[in-house]
């Protein structure tokens, strides 16, 4: 009887959490999601997939991210990293994803920092309104305290600022398949691009180590 009661209580709790997680944000592999609603996001890796999803409550949210498209030039892989973008949006009961321009070279991708021509769209390709700003830092980029910078930004009256009292992340962990660092992102990217024979050789090489 006691076990049944515990099970019932757990089921009710999970149902309650699930009922409030009404926004699903899909994160592509070229997006480095840094903060959500002033919180660091822990990424869970799964090697063979390249998409991530984040469940959020209905309401207003702030995302902080970099856009890192990857280009192949000869034998080299070139990553073009944008400045950090701070964006605030509101939504209810939506499946939301990022939409970026298509660039065919690293040189053209550098225009993204100037144009900031990305979108948030729902599953019907409708745009989700948002405010945005770049988090510009003129000093050494290594060792930046981005969370502190964003907290300072959020004290301003900028439309993209995130104020206390807004709803927060329902699940701090993202169901992620892109990895936490550039090296792992590269592995995911080129594994997906490889033919079946190359994939099999790669898998054999890591299982034999």
Swiss-Prot record:
It comes from the Bacteria. Residues 1-21 form the signal peptide. InterPro entries: UPF0319 (IPR018635). The keyword Flavoprotein does not apply. The keyword Signal applies. It holds the Pfam family DUF2057. Keywords: Signal. Belongs to the UPF0319 family. This is UPF0319 protein VFMJ11_1730. It comes from Aliivibrio fischeri (strain MJ11).
